[in-house]
């Protein structure tokens, strides 16, 4: 009787461990898959929207211009973060200097968000009308996933 009970307990423990490992593995797989998909919206859009050669050329020019604009704003954002760090290092309390540096960070971050949205709509305008619904679906789905 003791042998049977020990065996059932061992099998239950093994089953529980395997179930736990399976759940953890599935969670890791799906969370990383979604992060990768969410992180590269640009690639998803290109896969979802069937571009012709003319559209590709137009969009490539728009993408190059946006990449330059993004680099400029990101440089400002890094500089603003540096000023904020300096202000906090000088006086580790809320101060007029920290407030001013915080506002500079917020302006740069807001500029980056606006530039990104302008770029999204410029890209859409470069598509043929029949390709815009697919673009819109991917964009809206990505925004909704990001808000959850």
Curated annotation (Swiss-Prot):
Pfam families in UniProt: Metal_resist
The record's induction entry says: By nickel and cobalt.
Role this protein plays: CnrH alone is able to activate cnr expression, while both CnrY and CrnR (CnrX) are needed for nickel induction of CnrH. Has been suggested to bind nickel.
| One GO CC term on file | periplasmic space
Into which family does the record put it?
A: To A.xylosoxydans NccX.
The record's keywords, sorted A to Z, are: Cobalt, Coiled coil, Nickel, Periplasm, Plasmid, Signal
Q: Which residues form a coiled coil?
A: 54-117
From the Swiss-Prot or TrEMBL record, state where the protein is found.
Answer: Periplasm
Residue intervals on the Periplasmic side: 28-148
Biological source species? Cupriavidus metallidurans (strain ATCC 43123 / DSM 2839 / NBRC 102507 / CH34) (Ralstonia metallidurans)
Instruction: Look up the signal peptide feature and give its range.
Output: 1-26
| Name of protein | Nickel and cobalt resistance protein CnrR
């Amino acid at each position: 009787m003791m042998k049977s009970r020990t065996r059932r307990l061992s099998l239950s423990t093994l089953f529980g461990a395997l179930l736990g490992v399976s759940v953890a593995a599935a969670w890791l797989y799906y969370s990383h898959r979604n992060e990768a998909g969410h992180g590269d919206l640009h690639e998803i859009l290109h896969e979802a929207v069937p571009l012709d050669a003319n559209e590709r050329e137009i969009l490539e020019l728009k993408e190059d211009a946006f990449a330059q604009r993004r680099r400029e704003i990101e440089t400002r954002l890094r500089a603003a973060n540096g000023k904020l760090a300096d202000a906090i290092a000088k006086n580790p309390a809320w101060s007029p200097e920290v407030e001013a540096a915080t506002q500079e960070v917020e302006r740069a971050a807001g500029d980056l968000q606006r530039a990104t949205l302008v770029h999204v709509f410029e890209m859409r305008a470069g598509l043929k009308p029949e390709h815009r619904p697919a673009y819109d679906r991917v964009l809206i789905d990505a925004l909704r996933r990001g808000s959850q």
